[in-house]
């Protein structure tokens, strides 16, 4: 089995030719994730990565989507990279099968928080189906530690139809898991939009929890909506201003240092 290393400055599209590199050199701070793009030039169903000692490695798949040609001629009809999906989730949802004779993937390596500054040689072993390949990565660790709080602020929505559970407790558990996943990848949530009923006390508790979390660069409250027929659209989603007024009043009356 072979693994071809791609330059991180190159965006590989299905069908493009590519240089086949073997040397891998990365740089990052303690606690940071560094990454490289690679290709397994044969069909495979699943792939995982392991690293030496305290170094952690993780693989993401680059999933493709087929686009039609645009009327402007900017895009041709072909398959383009769409999103990256981590290997464990891809396997769970049967979303990691390569049908193109090659597989584009990203390998992430986490630099330990206590790693010594300087140059390290880390052995990475990638397993795909029944085959294995090992590569050595030269990783230069900078002499500082990445802060817990990050500046990568993102906005994402969580809908009831995304979390398949009618039980409120299970819904909240899965909701919290999604929030933690964003924080794990240094994406600080700014808008959480769960459908369903959030009590005022529950919203206050959640806000206190997130504003006290040093990993969160920003956070905003969930809000409540309802469906209403308007002159613009049937079943349009509208902001529940009465709920919002009660929520903001509760915050004003229960302010904290955070």
Tell where the protein language model's regions lie, with residue ranges.
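Surface-exposed binding patches on compact interaction domains or structured appendages
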Residues: 2-20, 33, 43-108, 115
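Non-cytosolic beta-sheet module surface loops
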Residues: 40-42, 128
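Hydrophobic residues positioned within well-ordered beta-strands of beta-sheet architectures
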Residues: 36, 47, 105-107, 122, ...
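Aromatic-lined carbohydrate-binding surfaces of glycoside hydrolases
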Residues: 84, 96, 110, 121-123, ...
């Amino acid at each position: 089995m072979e693994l071809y290393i791609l330059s991180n400055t190159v965006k590989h599209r299905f069908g493009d030719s590519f240089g086949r590199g073997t040397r891998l050199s990365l740089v990052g701070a303690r606690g940071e994730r560094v990454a490289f793009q690679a290709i397994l030039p044969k069909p495979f169903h699943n792939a995982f990565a392991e690293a030496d000692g305290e170094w952690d490695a993780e693989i993401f798949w680059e999933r493709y989507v087929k686009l039609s040609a645009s009327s402007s001629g900017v895009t041709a009809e072909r398959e383009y990279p769409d999103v990256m999906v981590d290997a464990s989730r891809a396997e769970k949802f049967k979303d990691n099968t390569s049908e193109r004779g090659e597989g584009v993937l990203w390998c992430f390596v986490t630099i330990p928080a206590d790693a010594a500054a300087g140059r390290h040689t880390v052995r990475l072993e990638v397993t795909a189906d029944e085959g294995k390949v090992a590569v050595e990565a030269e990783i230069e660790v900078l002499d500082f530690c990445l802060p817990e709080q990050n500046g990568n602020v993102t906005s994402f929505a969580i809908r009831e139809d995304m979390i398949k559970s009618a039980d409120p407790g299970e819904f909240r558990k899965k909701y919290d898991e999604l929030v933690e996943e964003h924080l794990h990848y240094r994406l600080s949530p700014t808008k959480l939009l769960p459908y369903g009923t959030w009590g005022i006390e529950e919203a206050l508790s959640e806000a206190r929890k997130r504003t006290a979390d040093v990993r969160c660069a920003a956070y905003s409250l969930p809000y409540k909506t309802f469906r209403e027929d308007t002159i613009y659209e049937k079943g349009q989603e509208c902001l529940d201003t009465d709920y919002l007024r009660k929520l903001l009043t509760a915050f004003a009356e229960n302010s904290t240092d955070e």
